[in-house]
């Protein structure tokens, strides 16, 4: 199980590449039928006329601390996926933005994430799903994605291991990418490295040096880590 705590195999040129990606998608604002009412969502569909190798859901950080689907880290993750020609669905958890309901401490939010998968899957029949999430959203997304057979790959961004039980991952054999700031306030580097090293299956951890939980000033490296991992797994992907 490879554990990369740096950009092993990537040139310095790639690390410094300007990731100002152009937008090549149709954007749809919609509401999903959630368990406690409607869930506000945005679906980006690539304008390329080809079947994508993946379709993705990206979950946002903790809503009680200002997290929404418009969070900068979530937006950058979605933008990176979009640049690769991957359809992306972002949504607001219950009680966030225009979504109905109240925050449920990560329990009901798992049902919300499942609704997002249920909506996305029939939009792209037969296409495997990728579940990604940032911070609180990474825990929700990983929990749901590990259980759901439609999800074949997982991405955890800013994994908050300091205060969260992540033992559920010990039973998850699906390929996983973790992108983490070396100075993350909510996930000590050493602990994240230990957690990922002990996981079954194919896992990669990319530590972004000098970055905090929100990857301030380091979003180019953040974007490059996601793009590189997906291109390795899916050589047919190419950045627009």
Q: Residue spans of the language-model regions?
A:
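Short, surface-exposed "cap/lid" segments of acyl-processing enzymes
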Residues: 48-90
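Acidic catalytic loop of the alpha/beta-hydrolase fold
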Residues: 182-187, 214
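Short beta-strand/loop motif that positions the catalytic acidic residue
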Residues: 172, 178-180, 184
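Gly/Ala-rich beta-loop-alpha elbow adjacent to hydrolase catalytic centers
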Residues: 133-141
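Catalytic histidine neighborhood in serine/cysteine hydrolases
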Residues: 198-214
